[in-house]
Amino acid sequence: MSIFSARLASSVARNLPKAANQVACKAAYPAASLAARKLHVASTQRSAEISNILEERILGVAPKADLEETGRVLSIGDGIARVYGLNNIQADEMVEFSSGLKGMALNLEPDNVGVVVFGNDKLIKQGDIVKRTGAIVDVPVGDELLGRVVDALGNAIDGKGAINTKDRFRVGIKAPGIIPRVSVREPMQTGIKAVDSLVPIGRGQRELIIGDRQTGKTALAIDTIINQKRFNEAQDESKKLYCIYVAIGQKRSTVAQIVKRLTDSGAMGYSVIVSATASDAAPLQYLAPYSGCAMGEYFRDKGKHALIIYDDLSKQAVAYRQMSLLLRRPPGREAYPGDVFYLHSRLLERAAKMSPAMGGGSLTALPVIETQAGDVSAYIPTNVISITDGQIFLETELFYKGIRPAINVGLSVSRVGSAAQTKAMKQVAGSMKLELAQYREVAAFAQFGSDLDAATQQLLNRGVRLTELLKQGQYVPMAIEDQVAVIYCGVRGHLDKMDPAKITKFEKEFLQHIKTSEQALLDTIAKDGAISEASDAKLKDIVAKFMSTFQG
């Protein structure tokens, strides 16, 4: 009998009268013993059930340890946070502050980490916890971005809701090597006569647009985007060109105007705008070009074609200088850090024409640089000129003379684009660059002497008329076949006796005439990409007939 049973029996016996005590004890012991045994069996069964339930629960738990590496803010100011404790962090890794703000680790020092803050640093204070994300800075990429305006981190800022993309690309991807590339061979038509004829651009090229403020740099870039509408409306994917416009350090009102212009022109459907305006933090202005480039690389790596415009890289360099000086990196020429060349070279080298084995896609870059008083020998302009495959140089003097686009044909050059220029344009524009160069040379001396020989006078006449012919309004890009027809009139001498003031009117009426009555010829030039002998004779005949009826 167990101790429990004995105690139960004695308890029952104590409560009975003394006379019946002995009898009761004898009767109570067996009953108490039986009750105790039943209780013991029941408790043992319940214990077994509980053990089984606990065992099932323990086995069902996934062995997951939620470890986070955190640090604390030592100091914060001017968009730079010094953080202690993140010993295993990677360079360019994204971190998250307790306020929800994001940042990027740029300086990895023995006792602290220099973090640039993507936003308003007033939301961060000393002692705040900083958490590693384990991810290098990346942005959303994909077709879902087309038609949207995003910030440097790929977040929608156009009020049209969140963007749900399937893929994300790192912003700092290494540029393609030599083997995956091929030489530039397909034309990237801007729709601007002066560019497509004299400084042609190919798909996969880097062509710099450089000039002082208010000389039409952005207008040139926007016209190029608008001109792609004629290709993007067609079904042929190989002809389509997706456009990314990166606005760095510009006014918000300017970006809003660009969005409106592209929307009104029907160009927003194949474009993405990445905006890091002057009111955004310097780290966002530094990051925006890389983010836009990653979005363009998505199309390039899918075998498609993309165009990216960086407007402008001078402001990115200024933002990078600000960050570097605040991070206590040693300054160099013009107070820029020593790696400012690498800042732009690693960005622009990502523009490439890929080989057929790599999908045959391309990413064309049009970086913009703003000069001060026409000084192209400054640090940043010379850096970017040496990285790119040519430059379009815009001059204030030409702009105020009414020559718009204000392209200085002598200083502008395309180092690889001529290989991509259509044969038809080569046929008509081949002699034009030489004639314009000779005209500029002679024009300087012509103002000193009145008695010029006939050949020199002829050169001056032709140069004045060709310069007039290359003028073009904003937001009216031209198809390549229209450009060929107009330039043909100038280089073949049909306009030599015309009053230069009437050339703009002539161009408008001539194009109207040829489109209404001779559209088949334009279609043939566009399809063949060249002017055959038959087309040449027909075009000559059309021009002669029109000239006889043109009133001016």
Curated annotation (Swiss-Prot):
Cellular component, GO, one term: proton-transporting ATP synthase complex
SUPFAM superfamilies: C-terminal domain of alpha and beta subunits of F1 ATP synthase (SSF47917), N-terminal domain of alpha and beta subunits of F1 ATP synthase (SSF50615), P-loop containing nucleoside triphosphate hydrolases (SSF52540)
Protein location: Mitochondrion inner membrane
Similarity section: Belongs to the ATPase alpha/beta chains family.
Subunit structure of this chain's protein: F-type ATPases have 2 components, CF(1) - the catalytic core - and CF(0) - the membrane proton channel. CF(1) has five subunits: alpha(3), beta(3), gamma(1), delta(1), epsilon(1). CF(0) has three main subunits: a, b and c.
NCBIfam families given in the database record: atpA, PRK13343.1
Protein name, UniProt field: ATP synthase subunit alpha, mitochondrial
Upper taxonomic lineage: Eukaryota, Metazoa, Ecdysozoa, Arthropoda, Hexapoda
GN (gene name): blw
